[in-house]
Amino acid sequence: NKQAGALVGLHYHLHQADYWYVPIGIARVVLHDLRVGGPTDGNTACFNISGENHWGVYIPPGVAHGFSAVTDVVMTYLVDGYYNPADELGVAWNDTEIGGDWVVTDPIVSERDQTNPLRVDLPEGRRPYWPMRT
């Protein structure tokens, strides 16, 4: 659960896929493809998911993902494997190269997400390449 104005992300995984669904509230989703050499490398997509449109979002490995709570939000998410803290990676939510449209003004951002590096500064061993090997 997140209160209106909260911003989570951008996170990404080299091995894990996520699936998000919002039964209550409105979340503004921002996805950015970090997979170097892939057909959609560098593309950013922004859209809302909510209890009204009933959209679910599949997020493959190598795609940075985050959301802002447009309203108070309840989000359910599934992952395709066991939790691995070494696969919890991040990139700056406000990176101008990514250019996400977060909708909220004056977002509430966790300390962890405030310190994520810019895309250009991602360490070599933490950069996803196409094709992904899980």
Segments predicted by a language model, with ranges:
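Short beta-strand His + acidic residue motifs that chelate non-heme Fe in jelly-roll/DSBH
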Residues: V57, H65-V70
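Non-catalytic, conserved peripheral segments adjacent to functional cores
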Residues: N1-W55, D72, Y77, G81-T134
